[in-house]
Amino acid sequence: MATVHILTQYVWPDAAPTGLYAEQLAARLEQDGRDVRLVGGRGGYRELQRKRPVARITHLNHYRGSRGNLRQSFTEYASVTRAFCDYIGRFVRHDDVVVVTSAPPNTVTLAQAIRRRGARSIYWLQDYYPELVRGLYEYPVPLRAVFRRFWDHHLGRWDRIVKIGSNLGGPTRNAVVIRNWPTMSFDRPTAPEPRTALYSGNLGYGHDIELLVHACGKLRTAGYRVTMRSDGRGAWQLPAWLQPMPLENDPAKLRDDLLRHEVHLVAANPKITQAIFPSKIWNTFAARRKLVCTGFAGPMIEELEISKLAPFDRHLEQWTDLIATAQNSGQPNRVERIEPALA
């Protein structure tokens, strides 16, 4: 039986968002009877208590930097990518399927290593880095164009790119849109506490902190009690009245937190519209809570409106169908492109 290898920087017991999605895809594939390996590094991003998702999890050795230290982070990115390349050379066989997430970003260069093994390659584009780095440094437009050409050249080498939203940059020729989904279930309807608002998650390079603080201020003026649970560099920039609490690391408490609040805040950056689409939105949709989105503009607003109608309970099935097609074809994956409005 051919193996599906899913490679991402952080895996269980860590709880980075990309890792959570990777493990839930792996668990579904294992449930369907497929041979699957979840492969990641040994670094730490975020804690969340949960049981082991699949039987076969491989943790690779690599340099581990300090989160928040850019030099160390980039060194870790390169080290993880080298470890992935070594893993591909040693363990990937002809006709296997290799799914690689955009964490770390350097993994965009791994398509040729997978092709040399005679396997099919799928790149899971959670973040489009030529645009995302603008949150760190607003580099000149000509340089941006050069970086995009370089990145898109490497993206074009993959048999298939899976974008999590129609707003993400990158080539379209080999791309399909399969959106993310709620990472937890909300089976029992629960009424929220009135006039409560919650931000829960990362505040990083793709977020306009000033716009988020302004929205929180308007809610506070309207009588809402605003709870801020966040990590990342943006958390350091919050005013004293919005000082963040730690993120919940117990899934039951996190679920209760999401259900208890009437309004969920989601942040973006209006200058950076092709880099990300916030995955936390899907838990809000599933919990049936009100959304207050800050920094959404252009393509992100369009993607938000599409996502409100998207059948998120089918998104994992779209993934398994795509992988089944890749495994059953003797050639690179040729499934029909899923149009953004229909994904």
Residues covered by each model-derived region:
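N-terminal subdomain of nucleotide-sugar transferases
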Residues: M1-K51, R160, H214-G223
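Carbohydrate-associated surface elements
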Residues: R42, I164-N167, I178-W181
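An aromatic- and histidine-rich active-site surface loop
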Residues: S79-F84, G89, V97-R117, Y123-Q126, ...
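Membrane-proximal helix-turn-helix segments that form the acceptor-binding/catalytic region
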Residues: N106-T109, A113-R116, Y129, V141-I161
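Acidic anion/phosphate-binding donor-loop and adjacent secondary structure
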Residues: V176-R195, D208, G330
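Conserved donor-binding/catalytic core segment of Leloir-type glycosyltransferases
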Residues: P189-H207, V213-C216, T227
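Nucleotide-sugar-dependent
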Residues: H207, D250-D256, H264-F285, V292-E303
